Amino acid sequence: IAFCSCSNYPAGYFNAYREMARNENIDLVLHLGDYLYEYAWDGYASESAIQMDRVVDPNHEILSLDDYRRRHATYRKDLDLKLLHASKPMIVVWDDHEITNDTWEGGAQNHSSDEGSFKKRKDFATQAYFEWMPIRENKNKKQIWRNFTVGNLINLLMLDTRLYNRDKQLDIEKYFEIDNFKEKKYMNDLKKPRNLLGKTQLKWVKSKTNNKYKWSIFGQQILIGPKYLPAILKFVELETLPSYVHKYVMLAGKKIPYNTDQWDGYPKEREEFFEIIKNSQSNLILAGDSHNSWISNLRDNNDKFVGVEIGAPSISSPNFVDTFGEMTTEIDKSFVESNEDLVWTNGINKGYVELEVSFNFVDVHFHYVSTVKSQKYEKLQTKSFRVNHAQPLA
C-alpha cells in the first residue's frame, strides 16, 4: 500500500506519482487529500509556474462548478498523474483544498463574504470531486468515510476529518499580544469540546473497529499526535525567518500545540477516538496535510500506547525546507528532541510512503525524489522503519 497527499500543480512536477506508478510492489494507492488546490494562477506556491509551464486553469481562485471541473481537468493533463491512475487502483478522501483552505463544516479560512455562499461553493466542489475522482457516490454525498478489508490482515478505515461535521478551528492568532502569548487562556479554550469526526462518524468508527484483524489502518487527513515547536527556534535570528513565523518563536520548546487545524485543536475528541481504537489489535494512523514526513508513537492522556502515526510528505507542495532553507536539518532534529513521542521527521524531501504489511510487522518506507522543479530527477535513498505488531517504535 502506498499513500500520499498534497499535490500542488504549479508548485512542481509530480515526479513522485511517476515513481509510485513504476513501483511494482504497490498494489494500492491511498490519496489522503489536497489532490488539487483552489488558488489563482499567481497564488500559493506558484512562483515557478510560468517557467515550468504549470499555470492552472481557470486562472482565478475557483468558486463555481465550472471552475472546479476545469481545475480537475488541469491536473488530469499531467502525464505522471495519468500514468498513476492507469497503473494503480486508488482510494481517495478529500482534505481542505479540494474545496478551499482550512475548511470546516460551515466555512473556511479562504472563503470571504464577497465570494458568495459557502454552502454552494462546497456543493460545487464536492460535485466536481465525485465526477472526476475514483470514488462511488452514496445517498449522502458528504459522507465519504468507508472501510475495506483484506482477509484477516487489514481493516482499512478511510475517514473525513475535514468537511462533514468539523467545528471551526480555534484561532491561535487571537492569543498573541505584543511580546506575549496568552498561554493559560489558550490552553483552557483548547480543552473545550469540538467536533472533528463528529458523533455520527465516531459511532461508525466504533462499529467497524474490532480485534478480528491484525492491523487496523486509518487513512485520514491530518496529524493526530501532539506536535510542539522545536526549541531551536528560540536561538535563531528572527531576520533569517519569514515574518509570519516570528511570533511563534514565543512557543518554541514549550508544550503548547501550535496548529489547531490538526487533531491538536480537537484534543477531547482525540481522546474519544483513541479510546475507540484500543479495541483493535494494532493501529496505524496515516496522515497527509502537513507536507512533511513524520513517524510517531501515539499515547493517550494516561500514557497508554495506542498506535503509530505515519505522516506523508507532499507530492509537490512546499515543506519546511521551503521556509527554513539550510536550517531545516537542525530544525528536524530539534523537533524530535522537543516531542518525546516523535521518532523521526523529514522536512526537506517530497515523495510518498509505502507500507509492506505482514502479520507480525509492517515495514514503512519513505520514498523521495531529488527535485520537483524539473522532470529530470533522481530517486533518493529510502528511509525505512519496522513497526512490530502492537508495539511502539523503539
Q: Where in this protein do the model-derived segments appear?
A:
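Metal-dependent phosphoester/phosphodiester hydrolase catalytic core
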Residues: 1-394
